[in-house]
Structures are given as structure tokens and as C-alpha cells.
């Protein structure tokens, strides 16, 4: 339960960052978040004209096979790294 509470707190805190992380950091965070919440990707890849949707899909797809616990822990670590880098 403590892991879930830490995850929820990290997800909340990362929304309060003073500066916007770069696209690579955001995609990494998104992929870990979706893997932690949903698990392996379960939607079709968006069309090639949906650049934002495709980038998000690819970020999530890269995390395929990662367990929920591992994705949750990795998300918390990445969020802490971004909080240290950008501040809240």
C-alpha cells in the first residue's frame, strides 16, 4: 500500500513542477505511468498523422512487459528526479 501512496503523491507532485520537462522526459514519465496503471499496451497504434498520439503510444509500448510494481517504482524514481531537477 505504501508503494501506491508514494505513486499517487509522485503523480500529484509532478504536475506542480516549476518548469516543463523536455519531451523525452515527459514521454518516459507517460510510458511508466500508463504501464503502472493499465499494464501492457492494449490499444492500436494511432495513425501517422496523429503525431502526439503516436509518440505517447510508442512511449507506453516501450514499457511493455514491465511489471506493475516495477513500473510504479520506476515512475516514482523518475518523478523524484524531475522534482529535484525542476522543483515544485
UniProtKB/Swiss-Prot annotation:
The keyword tRNA processing does not apply. Signal peptide: none annotated. Coiled coil: none annotated. Keywords: Lipid-binding. InterPro entries: Acyl-CoA-binding_protein (IPR000582), Acyl-CoA-binding_sf (IPR035984), FERM/acyl-CoA-bd_prot_sf (IPR014352). An acyl-CoA binds at residues 15, 30-34, 56, 75. It holds the Pfam family ACBP. GO terms for molecular function: fatty-acyl-CoA binding. Residues 3-88 form the ACB domain. SUPFAM superfamilies: Acyl-CoA binding protein. Belongs to the ACBD7 family. Binds medium- and long-chain acyl-CoA esters. This is Acyl-CoA-binding domain-containing protein 7.
Amino acid at each position: 500500500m505504501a508503494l501506491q501512496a508514494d505513486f499517487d503523491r509522485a503523480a500529484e507532485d509532478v504536475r506542480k513542477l516549476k518548469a516543463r520537462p523536455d519531451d523525452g522526459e515527459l514521454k518516459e514519465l507517460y510510458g511508466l505511468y500508463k504501464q503502472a496503471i493499465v499494464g501492457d499496451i492494449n490499444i492500436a497504434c494511432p495513425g501517422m498523422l496523429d503525431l502526439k498520439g503516436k509518440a505517447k503510444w510508442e512511449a507506453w509500448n516501450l514499457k511493455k512487459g514491465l511489471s506493475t510494481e516495477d513500473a510504479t517504482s520506476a515512475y516514482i524514481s523518475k518523478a523524484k528526479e524531475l522534482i529535484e531537477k525542476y522543483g515544485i
